[in-house]
Amino acid sequence: AYHEIDSVSQLAAQYNIPNEYDKLMASIGSEGSNAYTSNDVTCYVENIPSNEIENWARIQANRFRNMIIRGFHTELEAVYEEKNISMGSDGTKEYAALWKLLTPTHPYGTQTTIGEQEHLKNPSIVNIKNYFHRYYVPNNVAIALAGDFDPDATIAVIDKYFGTWKAGKQLTRPEFPAQKAITMPRDTSVVGQDAENVMMGWRFKGANQLQNDTLDIVRRMLSNGKAGLLDINIDQQMKAMETGAFLDDLHDYSAQN
């Protein structure tokens, strides 16, 4: 029962420090502590002073080896609220419908990143921990650094704190059948409260293909906020409320929209 869950959550709260991680990172001068999940990656972001790289490495190495889950119940409520907001967004529903047409038998089209309400109703902490131990392993992680730092010294620090992290033996990568060729236009409608609009998309190969550089140039030629073909011929002449073009360069497939 939910009252039992709440009572246990209150007991757990006695061991919880609110915003513990943010406070820890702020103590070493970090700004912009954040994370996001997309179709292809889960990414954790920090903006740290270059003289705090060692403290950053010490914290992150411990964090990703020894996950401590606190505030699970309250965090779940936050995620559920995000789902509710997305369900009320015509743009979000339209975007999902477009990818369903482009990749009907691939997860890009069959599910959203946040999932369905049913997925959030009864989450399993056991499954979450199993997922962590399978995928949060060094042979499935990339560390990307940019800024004013000594590369050799920084690599030595990373080796010091991450070098003994054992590779995961259970790591698997999902494989999906190739999408069938699109031989004729596909269309659908999304009903909502927003003004009528049209979203069009063309499916291409994945982001690691050279073709994507060309697609990015085409996208900028169409729409760049000032002198794109759509900007000049439609927006500036007030033939539509708004136009735009963007490239979804995902790992398995890209879409020019």
Located regions from the model:
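Non-catalytic beta-strand/loop surface segments
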Residues: 1-51, 85-140, 164-209, 220-257
